Each structure stands twice: as structure tokens, then as C-alpha cells.
């Protein structure tokens, strides 16, 4: 079971979060981290923890009854253990009446982050 923790620059695993963000998403798709850290009511940047272990994060924007997951990444050492699904469950629980939108890409075997 994952625990959701809002991410700030003071987060204990901020360096690891930043590293995962850079490793998981191509530069052309990333936005500045400061934009993800805004926490302005419409945006969320949340880490998932299994006990004390940082597993991954998501970033989402909510407008009305739509929550759009912009970024979701799981530490590569922890993939295929259900953490991605658990992270989606966290989003759904935080927004029980919203439609959840997730953009997904097919794996590209030639991509450097595969």
C-alpha cells in the first residue's frame, strides 16, 4: 500500500525524485520542476512511498470534474510490482467524482529511457 506525500524542494527524497523525472521523461516532454512544485490548488506533485521507500511520483492538474495526470513515473528498480496501479488508485481516491485522464505512450525500444 502506497502512502501519498506532497513533493516540495524540502522533501527528503527530492534529489531522487528529480533524478527519476529526468530519467523517465525525454527533455522535450519535461516542464521545469518549479512548475510542478506550484501546488496552486489545481496542481499536484505527489510522491508515493511504501513504508520509507520512495517508489515514484505523479503530477496532475484538476479542472472541474477532470483530473489529468501529466507525469507518472515509478523507480525502474521497483517496476512490475503494482506500484503504478497503486499510484493510479491514489489519484482516483483523491478525486472520487472526477474523470481521470492519463496520456500513455507505446514503448519505443530505441528510446534511451527504455
Task: Explain the meaning of each model-derived region.
Residues 22-50:
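Active-site rim helix/loop that mediates acceptor-substrate recognition in acyltransferases
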Residues 95-113:
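Conserved GNAT acetyl-CoA-binding A-motif
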Residues 74, 80-93:
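Conserved acetyl-CoA-binding loop-helix of GNAT-fold acetyltransferases
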Residues 2, 43, 97-98:
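A structural micro-motif
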Residues 1-31:
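Short amphipathic alpha-helix that is part of the acyltransferase structural core
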Residues 64, 76, 108:
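Feature marks short, surface-exposed loop/turn motifs that line or immediately flank catalytic pockets
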Residues 47, 52-62, 66-73:
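Conserved beta-strand in the GNAT
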Amino acid at each position: 500500500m502506497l502512502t501519498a506525500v506532497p513533493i516540495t524542494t524540502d522533501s527528503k527524497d527530492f534529489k531522487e525524485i528529480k533524478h527519476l523525472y529526468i530519467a523517465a521523461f525525454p527533455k522535450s516532454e519535461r516542464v521545469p520542476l518549479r512548475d510542478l512544485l506550484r501546488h496552486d490548488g489545481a496542481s499536484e506533485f505527489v510522491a508515493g512511498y511504501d513504508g520509507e521507500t520512495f517508489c515514484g511520483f505523479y503530477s496532475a492538474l484538476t479542472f472541474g470534474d477532470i483530473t489529468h495526470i501529466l507525469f507518472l513515473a515509478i523507480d525502474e528498480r521497483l517496476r512490475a510490482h503494482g506500484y503504478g496501479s497503486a499510484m493510479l488508485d491514489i489519484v482516483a481516491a483523491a478525486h472520487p467524482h472526477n474523470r481521470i485522464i492519463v496520456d500513455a505512450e507505446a514503448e519505443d525500444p530505441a528510446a534511451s529511457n527504455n
